[in-house]
UniProtKB/Swiss-Prot annotation:
EC number of the protein: 3.1.26.-
Record key words, sorted: Endonuclease, Hydrolase, Nuclease, RNA-binding, rRNA processing
Gene (UniProt): fau-1
Enzyme class: hydrolase
InterPro entries: DUF402, FomD-like_sf, Ntdp-like, RNA-bd_AU-1/RNase_E/G, RNA-bd_FAU-1
HAMAP family associated with the record: RNA_binding_AU_1
Gene3D superfamilies cross-referenced by the UniProt entry: FomD-like (2.40.380.10)
Protein name: Probable ribonuclease FAU-1
Listed Pfam families: DUF402, RNase_E_G
Coiled coil: none
Length: 473
């Protein structure tokens, strides 16, 4: 089982941010375990094989997102520090702990899914329609935690508990599964053998990757402890109201902004030669990854970093100039990705330490421009100005005769250039200006909402408000 919260968290770090994050973890006073060989050599770390309380790595679905998974007490400690160090990103946290035992009360069928409530959280309960009976109470385990606001947690019947080496599950189909990271055939055979007596008692066993480092006696003891914990969780859940009855894992996704990636660049540079935009390129422009590697080798030989960055920006500008069109992609605090559609690239150049890009779209349909409340007509032009060092993207709307219909200034984190898109975190609050009228702030309440939910940090909210007030005069 997990060790009490008084212990310093043990952290496993993987992925494209590993060097910067390992430096952060060490500076925060936490213990790095199961380091990769490169990280162990880079930081002169011992190859500790102790089980991790928290794992931090880039998400398999989006390399601009950090995935943080671990015991809730440990994740709480990590997040408190991380939100201070990387304040300009979005933080999404699971609404129910993964692999926890819960008691849910059925609400009923909705869109052919059985919906139940655990406290104030709605979740999908995986049962037959005939078992989806209003007010029925079910003891189950969380198999999908629901991380982003629009994601619904998922529960299956049967209690479950998680520990350092295994997950033990009440199951009508007892079986043994083993992490793909346990590669030794001998170890896999041993794990299967140890679990046999538990499957015979009606439990499913999943061995976690850390099990490859433990001895047989420790693993057998661990399963016995999990069995006791599961029985206790089952008993308390049956006797208590709907709620969470065993410790699970918190799951957090952090969508890193360009500003926070630059902070990670600086942290990495304190360990090994790193140029600005390292993490932006590694996460969003993998085709330029070797260019970054080469530039950093050259920097290590004494070449000025500013010259290397200038060359990198000019390379990106030349690539953009050779294209005709590019997408504009908002990342919303809700977790949605909103594409504005492809725009024609009119010009692109380097100015100081920034890329300046001018885009144009031609309107083909009728309607009303959101925020401006101005009629949209076929033939209108939308000219968009993007600077990669500014916290805004400016859209100016023109009638076919060239008359300005209005200006919409999107407040966002400094834009990044991906392989086929301009990407930024949309901060919801915006500025609109009609001809002859003063600029006006819109959608400030949306920013407040996501701040209250903990998705937007206080520092990011204050930054967005500062920009909005300055632009509104």
């Amino acid at each position: 089982m997990a060790t009490p919260a008084r212990r310093i968290p043990r952290v496993r770090v993987r992925g494209i941010y590993a060097t910067a994050l390992t430096k952060l973890v060490i500076d925060m006073g936490f213990q790095v375990v199961q380091p990769s060989r490169i990280i162990a050599d880079r930081f002169s770390l011992p190859m500790l094989t102790l089980p991790a309380d928290v794992t931090i790595k880039d998400s398999d679905n989006n390399p601009s997102e950090l995935l943080i998974v671990g015991y809730e007490w440990a994740v709480n400690i990590i997040l408190e520090k991380l939100r201070d160090t990387l304040p300009y990103s979005f933080y999404w946290r699971s609404s129910l702990p993964l692999h926890s035992t819960v008691k849910a009360r059925v609400i009923g069928l909705r869109d052919n899914r059985c919906i139940a409530r655990v406290g104030d959280v709605e979740a999908e309960l995986l049962v037959d329609r005939s078992e989806c009976i209003e007010d029925r109470e079910v003891v189950g385990g969380v198999v999908r935690p629901g991380v982003k606001p629009r994601e619904t947690p998922r529960i299956v019947p049967g209690a479950r508990v998680i520990g350092d080496y295994a997950i033990l599950i009440e199951s009508s189909e007892p079986r043994v599964t083993i992490s793909e990271h346990v590669r030794s055939p001998e170890k896999r055979a041993l794990l299967a053998a140890i679990a046999t007596s538990f499957t015979e008692q009606g439990y499913a066993v999943h061995w976690r990757s850390s099990s490859q480092h433990a001895e047989r006696e420790e693993l057998e003891k661990h399963l016995r402890q999990l069995r006791e914990a599961l029985a206790e969780a089952r008993k308390r859940a049956e006797e208590g109201p709907p709620g969470v009855y065993s410790e699970g894992e918190a799951v957090v996704l952090v969508h890193l902004s360009s500003a926070d990636k630059q902070k990670l660049d600086e942290i990495r540079d304190s360990v090994v030669a790193t140029i600005p935009y390292h993490h932006t390129v590694k996460s969003l422009q993998p085709s330029l990854s070797k260019v970054i590697d080469y530039a950093e080798k050259v920097k290590a030989l004494g070449v000025d970093s500013e010259k290397l960055v200038r060359a990198l920006l000019e390379l990106v500008a030349e690539d953009l100039a050779s294209r005709r069109r590019i997408r504009i992609l908002h990342v919303k605090p809700s977790g949605e990705y909103i594409e504005l559609g492809k725009a024609e690239i009119k010009s692109v150049y380097v100015e100081d330490k920034s890329l300046v890009i001018v885009l144009e779209r031609t309107v083909k349909s009728r309607g009303v421009y959101d925020g401006l409340g101005v009629e949209k007509e076929p033939g209108d032009r939308i000219v968009t100005e993007v600077r990669t060092d500014e916290w805004i993207v400016k859209h100016t709307y023109y009638a076919p005769d060239g008359t300005v219909k209005g200006t919409y200034i999107n407040i966002n984190t400094p834009p990044e250039i991906a392989e086929d898109a301009i990407v930024y975190l949309d901060l919801e609050i915006d500025i609109v200006k009609k001809p002859g009228k003063k600029p006006k702030i819109v959608d400030a309440e949306e920013l407040d909402k996501y701040h209250e939910q903990g998705i937007v940090t206080t520092k990011l909210k204050e930054k967005a408000l500062e920009i909005a007030r300055k632009l509104a005069g």
